[in-house]
Amino acid sequence: MHHPIIKPNHMQIPWHDPIRDQKELPVSQAPLPIRAGVVGRVGLLLLSCGTGAWRVRSSMNEIAEALGLVCAADIGLLSIEYTCSDGENTFAQTLTLTATGVNTAKLDQLERFVKRFPLDGVYMTADDLHLSLIHI
């Protein structure tokens, strides 16, 4: 039986593109889309490890709070729709995975990242944060 190849229905997310003009700022002082992007990326990475929605949401909220944001998220098996607000403006985004699995080693590293974030992550640049996340 012949099965057609299913092509991914998503586009790559250029996490570093919005950062170009903000390279030297700590992420806590970066514009809303950059701060919200960190929140969403951490959530998507956690979701990709196969962890539950409540755990993803809790971690996203920890990152958001450390960045001075309030975040509301709808989390499915393969996607996250979220909105972050800084009290004046909002930023909404939908992020989707093409597949999911279980990766407890990566999950452990991400949970450590989330726990350390309020202590030292808020002082890192967004570019450095995204580079850290690439290595997890």
Where are these regions (language model features)?
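Soluble N-terminal domains of membrane-associated systems
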Residues: 1-122
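Acidic, proline/serine/threonine- and glycine-rich low-complexity intrinsically disordered segments
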Residues: 72, 131-132
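Conserved small/polar residues in nucleotide/adenosyl-binding loops
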Residues: 134-136
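Short, conserved catalytic/metal-binding motifs centered on acidic residues
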Residues: 127
